[in-house]
Amino acid sequence: MYYIAADFGAGSGRVIVGCINNNELTLDEIHRFPNRQINLGGRVYWDFLALFEELKNGLKKAFKKYGPHIRSIGIDTWGVDFGLIDENGRLISNPVCYRDTRTAGILAKAFEQLPKEQFFRLAGNQFMEINTVFQLYSAVLENDAALKSAKKLLFMPDLFAYFLTGKAANEYTIASTSQMMNSISREWDDTIFSKLSLPKNLMQKIVLPGTIIGEITGDLQKELGGTCNVVAVGSHDTASALAAIAAEGDEWAFISSGTWSLMGTITPTPLLTPEVLTADFTNEGAVSGDIRLLKNITGLWLLQSLVKEWTAQGMNCDYSRMVAEGEKSDCESTIDVNDSRFTAPKSMKQAIDDYCRETNQRIPQSQGDYMRLVCLSLANEYARVKQELELSTGRRITTIYIVGGGSQNALLNKLTAQKTGCKVVAGPVEATAIGNIKVQARAAGELKDNDTPILKGNGMALKTYLPQS
């Protein structure tokens, strides 16, 4: 059978067709396209209309090539962001991006209504201004007209599914990033909504991965040249990526390495202790029904911003070359990757230079120096978070699985092994698509819960790094 994975990241999106045959999984990337943020009227948006058009383009290619053999499609995206639907079923506005500044300073205001400790016991999430609950609370405080017109709130993957099928639902793993869901009951939390005066009527039924949302609508079937069911997968991309990891035992952690680095481990139930709150971990849903205990860390956003800046200046930004130069660099300067100055600076290079100057460190002189600085800084942060995970869970961590695009960065993988003292298993690069497709195949009955298909082709390889290497 064939399954479509639509994977939307903060910088790009892909439509991938996966085939499982005799327990072997192969992938075919059908369509790739850029994603970007749009600044308009002092607000930062995602261009959902363009993204949906690209999704349709990918589906047209998939149906043309594979036709009636396609069983279903699953959609995953980044977390927290959402779109609002009016009473006529129309999108009110392009979704606001989590990097918009409307939530600046919102935490203190929210804690006046709902104390931090109580808030954490309910939702179990890391407190970040970007979280859905604070985006929605800022809209309430602004008396946002869009909110008054809204009848439904749909997270980004739910939004794509809605305009494919006409059916509205909130998928569990993406809902768990919102900080509005009770981590124990897995339902929308009445206390959070009432204390912050949030419109609970906008929320939809929470559905689990593997749920069939619906079939592609008739009009779209004609436009796309085919049809299939839309299946809720691990709609938060990290949940899908984690579903691709074939780990045994519990002495392991994962890093989903992309624009963000999401580092954590799996626990059977939410950990809501004061120690977990102090360490700033988040409890989010896993495809398995377990909990992803993790921390959101600024990731390759740092390098992506540098590359964007250098490219605009006409500089050569071949990634492999920069990694090779970084391996030869003797720059030992580091930054605090979570410092707010690196969230959305006008110039990432200048922000890094200023930080080094203020902390009496050597200012990088070459692209290789900047590559090493970023990778070393991330590896140091991973080592710190690893220790916090061990303290919070009472487990020893001996292996770290790095999945996603960042798993291709050999320098980062080597430094992570050295700084954490752990064996690092890097790959597969296509973990998110693999996990997405595995959920669909299980929903179709082609895979059982414990089945792990053999991975074949590009983007499937694993590479191991040892601390002494």
Label every model-predicted segment.
Residues 100:
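Carbohydrate-associated surface elements
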Residues 76-79, 209-210, 257-260, 399-407:
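Glycine-rich beta-strand-to-loop/alpha-helix junction loops that act as flexible
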Residues 1-93, 121, 149, 221-230, ...:
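N-terminal glycine/serine-rich phosphate-binding loop of ATP-dependent small-molecule kinases
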Residues 69-77, 152, 205, 392-404:
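Short glycine-rich phosphate-binding loop at a beta-alpha junction
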Residues 4-5, 17-19, 111-123, 134-155, ...:
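Active-site core segments that coordinate phosphate-bearing ligands/cofactors
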